[in-house]
């Protein structure tokens, strides 16, 4: 049986009640050569049972993995990647959604450019009909530009499709809230070419209480862990770029924590 072009990995934890819109837009994708891998992270509600029911009635090619223990989104994504059969990996958070032509446009850009990674802009949706388009950084074409891009590149796995082989011998770190920040520069480093679609194709739902917006005194520590992971994963020739990125991460983590404390 022919392997799909894309494997879409979706970590889930007590999230079934937020998933209807994302599943709807998966079923409406104009490019259909893909599989969906749900990774249930030991949900304590009926999410796993609902996923099994959905698998039986859905038109999508679906596989479901259940973690042995609660491991967080990074490890859940790693399990999904290990099970993936697609040439490229895409990620979707359980409460977010794609534009209907997300995969079609990503595939077209891959074919056109031969890139290892394609990424796009995204919408930040606030759940009340309001949304904001977030633009991304330009891509690199030369080595010196690649260095700058590692320092400045986007932080989201979900707005990207990534050649599956780039994940060989590297795993997403088990860092709550900052695993994307740690992982994207490494994937860019390992890539031969990155391409960019200047169009918002992903919807990120801003939901108070979700993992990425929850109040936590561990935020700054998460970014410190992300920086340490980066510093140990990329050669010294990129030391300046990683230090620059690390300073950004640490400052963001500190300011984020201060703002959250002020809101309590």
Q: Which ranges hold each PLM region?
A:
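A conserved acidic beta->alpha catalytic loop
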Residues: 25, 40-49, 69
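Flexible acidic/His/Gly-enriched loops in nucleotide-sugar-dependent glycosyltransferase catalytic domains
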Residues: 99, 104-174
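Short, well-formed alpha-helical segments that are part of the catalytic scaffolds
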Residues: 14-28
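C-terminal subregions of glycosyltransferases and related glycan-biosynthesis enzymes
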Residues: 1, 205-264
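Short beta-strand/loop segment that forms part of the nucleotide-sugar
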Residues: 34-42, 63-67, 94
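Short aromatic/hydrophobic "clamp" motif used to bind/position activated sugar donors
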Residues: 89
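Conserved nucleotide-sugar donor-binding catalytic segment
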Residues: 144-218, 222-223
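Glycine-rich, basic loop-to-helix element that forms the pyrophosphate-binding segment
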Residues: 67-84
